[in-house]
């Protein structure tokens, strides 16, 4: 499969859309830098075009659909994972593995010196994400990108061969 994950793109869109509100459950200023205006507008149009699916009475706008139907799962899971990550860091975690990382921006928003992040996803996702991060001038110095098939069964060896230290406390996220 050589296509980008539509689920990852939609999750990124949800986080970008959520940033426009005054009160945010999840603050993610980096997400906006990774999604193009064209992608944002195209996804918005697709959601509006399918509004009748969510609200058959035809009485819905983009914000209503997003806030009542689409955003709660993505925003809630992401917020829970980030709160858990912050707790793990307080408890001494020095490594952070993001399985099926997609366009997750948490490794770039953690403020913890000496924490190494490992983003693991399919090669085309890793390539696209690293290009988006580079274009947005996001510092990736604490992140190791690993292209891998998560169904391979050889993940432990792949991670270790990319600098993972099995003796350090590690937090693992699997939102993808």
Where do the protein language model's features map onto the residues?
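Conserved SAM/SAH-binding loop
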Residues: 149-152
């Amino acid at each position: 499969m050589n296509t980008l994950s539509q689920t990852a793109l939609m999750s990124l869109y949800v986080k970008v859309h959520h940033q426009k509100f005054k009160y945010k459950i999840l603050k993610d200023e980096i997400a906006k830098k990774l999604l193009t205006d064209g992608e944002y507008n195209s996804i918005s149009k697709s959601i509006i075009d399918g509004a009748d699916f969510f609200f058959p009475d035809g009485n819905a706008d983009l914000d209503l659909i997003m806030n009542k139907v689409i955003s709660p799962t993505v925003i809630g899971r992401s917020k829970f994972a980030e709160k858990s990550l912050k707790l793990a860091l307080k408890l001494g975690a020095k490594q952070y593995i993001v399985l099926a990382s997609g366009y997750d921006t948490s490794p770039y928003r953690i403020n913890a010196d000496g924490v190494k992040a490992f983003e693991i996803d399919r090669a085309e996702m890793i390539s696209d994400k690293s290009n988006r991060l580079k274009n947005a001038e996001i510092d990736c110095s604490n992140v190791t990108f690993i292209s891998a098939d998560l169904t391979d069964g050889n993940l432990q060896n792949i991670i270790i061969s990319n600098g993972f230290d099995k003796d350090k406390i590690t937090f693992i996220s699997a939102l993808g």
